[in-house]
Amino acid sequence: MSDNDTRPTDAEVEAELKGVPEDMIDRTSDNDELAKLREELETARQDVLYAKAETQNVRRRMEKDVADARAYAATGFARDILSVADNLSRALESIPADLREDDKFKNLVAGLEATGREIEKVFSSHGIVRIAAMGLPLDPHQHQAMIEMPSADAEPGTVIQELQAGYMIKDRLLRPAMVAVAKKPD
């Protein structure tokens, strides 16, 4: 062995291994071992890349779930409050014109109308919008046909009466509009 090369020669290694049982001697070369280590390293790199990708996918999914939860958190409450808005609207519609002009009822009517406007404003601020229905073709994704009525004025399949207003919350249906649809007269 030279001073510059501290690695033992093959002859020195063979001399050292004399007397050691054959099944205990590792005869793999450095190249084989290096190739095996490189393969293990590549496998580990792939595993790390897959783990990173999975982590990113989980993070994106969680961010979407959180965004959806924020956007649609009021859905249950909004459905419940729609009946209040419906009843207020019906109450206003049921007040006869002569009572609306009566001094005794003017303030009451004005208060009910202001409450209706406030409900619409709150709905709007939470992304809740009324679905357009009157005069439009029936859209099964937004309208629920309750009855068909003969009509000479409207095309068959056109909404001619809104029985109950429908609402969307952001891009999701909160409640379909209950409508009457035109059909050909008999």
Swiss-Prot record:
Source organism (scientific name): Novosphingobium aromaticivorans (strain ATCC 700278 / DSM 12444 / CCUG 56034 / CIP 105152 / NBRC 16084 / F199)
Function: Participates actively in the response to hyperosmotic and heat shock by preventing the aggregation of stress-denatured proteins, in association with DnaK and GrpE. It is the nucleotide exchange factor for DnaK and may function as a thermosensor. Unfolded proteins bind initially to DnaJ; upon interaction with the DnaJ-bound protein, DnaK hydrolyzes its bound ATP, resulting in the formation of a stable complex. GrpE releases ADP from DnaK; ATP binding to DnaK triggers the release of the substrate protein, thus completing the reaction cycle.
Subunit structure: Homodimer.
Compartment annotation: Cytoplasm
Name the UniProt record assigns to this protein: Protein GrpE
Keyword terms of this UniProt record: Chaperone, Cytoplasm, Stress response
InterPro entries the UniProt entry points to: GrpE, GrpE_coiled_coil, GrpE_head
Keyword Oxidoreductase assigned: no
Swiss-Prot/TrEMBL GO biological process terms: protein folding
Taxonomy, superkingdom: Bacteria
Entry's family note: Belongs to the GrpE family.
